[in-house]
From Swiss-Prot:
<dbReference type="InterPro" id="IPR001345">
    <property type="entry name" value="PG/BPGM_mutase_AS"/>
</dbReference>
<comment type="similarity">
    <text>Belongs to the phosphoglycerate mutase family. BPG-dependent PGAM subfamily.</text>
</comment>
<dbReference type="InterPro" id="IPR013078">
    <property type="entry name" value="His_Pase_superF_clade-1"/>
</dbReference>
<feature type="binding site">
    <location>
        <begin position="23"/>
        <end position="24"/>
    </location>
    <ligand>
        <name>substrate</name>
    </ligand>
</feature>
<dbReference type="InterPro" id="IPR005952">
    <property type="entry name" value="Phosphogly_mut1"/>
</dbReference>
<feature type="active site" description="Tele-phosphohistidine intermediate">
    <location>
        <position position="11"/>
    </location>
</feature>
<dbReference type="GO" id="GO:0004619">
    <property type="term" value="F:phosphoglycerate mutase activity"/>
</dbReference>
<protein>
    <recommendedName>
        <fullName>2,3-bisphosphoglycerate-dependent phosphoglycerate mutase</fullName>
        <ecNumber>5.4.2.11</ecNumber>
    </recommendedName>
</protein>
<dbReference type="GO" id="GO:0006096">
    <property type="term" value="P:glycolytic process"/>
</dbReference>
<keyword id="KW-0312">Gluconeogenesis</keyword>
<keyword id="KW-0413">Isomerase</keyword>
<feature type="active site" description="Proton donor/acceptor">
    <location>
        <position position="89"/>
    </location>
</feature>
<comment type="function">
    <text>Catalyzes the interconversion of 2-phosphoglycerate and 3-phosphoglycerate.</text>
</comment>
<dbReference type="InterPro" id="IPR029033">
    <property type="entry name" value="His_PPase_superfam"/>
</dbReference>
<keyword id="KW-0324">Glycolysis</keyword>
<comment type="subunit">
    <text>Homodimer.</text>
</comment>
<feature type="binding site">
    <location>
        <position position="100"/>
    </location>
    <ligand>
        <name>substrate</name>
    </ligand>
</feature>
Length: 249
């Protein structure tokens, strides 16, 4: 049986991750720690002998810069890259920019957990005139404004990620191409839920650490047969726990 592989990487720590703020579609850059994390991810992939034919990422620079740093380490700077807003982080609506712990202190940790991890729970929406609304961002000027969210749940994030997976990424993997996706915690969670057929309750407990390569192995029909993180297991466990704790007061 021929095993096909996919690498998923959440971007390295961003400036707003460092400040424990809801980031969503805000286009913040990597922190210095995040740049180091991205290079470490590249080193892990290089050590394990990975190289790629195609790369996919979002249009947000914390993801695109993570990918660039990884490809620098792999000496694959000329790899074909496709950027899509459909791989963007989930849009956190009016929560975008707020500190997660302060928001938990105000609204309660359980409410914030529902906003962060509930499958269908929508955070409060932005007003269309809010400067944070994607329709007011030149980055999305060529897109239909009706496609651009004012808030998103994980369910609506799945709705935009899955067609991109089915129509763009999946055919390349079936064709035998080696693919890496560098995206965001929730766009990766959306993909993991779909690929692994997880329930709404199961995905609520899944947390994706920054810049740790997640390897998926598939059979020839692209059914998942295994997945695992690259790196030190204890360190990865600590990083996952840190992500889970972000929404606590």
């Amino acid at each position: 049986m021929t095993i096909k592989k996919l690498i998923l990487v959440r971007h390295g720590e961003s400036e707003w991750n460092k400040e424990n703020r809801f980031t969503g579609w805000a286009d913040v850059d990597l922190s210095e720690k995040g740049r180091v994390e991205a290079q470490q991810a590249g080193n892990l992939l290089k050590k394990k002998g990975f190289s790629f034919d195609f790369a996919y990422t979002s249009v947000l620079r914390r993801a695109t810069n993570t990918l660039s740093l990884i490809l620098d380490v792999l000496q694959q700077q000329n790899l074909p890259i496709e950027k899509s807003w459909r791989l963007n982080e989930r849009h956190y609506g009016a929560l975008q920019g707020l500190n997660k712990s302060e928001t938990a202190a105000k609204f309660g940790s359980e409410q914030v957990k529902q906003w962060r991890r509930g499958f269908s729970t929508l955070p409060p929406a932005l007003n269309l005139n809010d400067p944070r609304a994607p329709a007011n961002d030149s980055l999305y000027a060529t897109l239909n404004k009706n496609d651009l969210p004012l808030t998103e749940s994980l369910a609506t994030t799945v709705d935009r990620v899955v067609p991109y997976w089915d129509e763009v990424v999946k055919p390349r993997i079936i064709d035998g191409k080696r693919v890496i996706i560098v995206a965001h915690g929730n766009s990766i969670r959306a993909l993991v839920k779909y690929v692994d057929h997880l329930s709404e309750e199961e995905i609520m407990e899944i947390n994706i650490p920054t810049a740790v390569p997640l390897v998926y192995e598939f059979n020839s029909s692209l059914q998942p047969i295994n997945h695992y993180y690259l790196g030190n297991a204890e360190e990865i466990t600590q990083k996952v726990a840190a992500v889970a704790a972000q929404g606590k007061a």
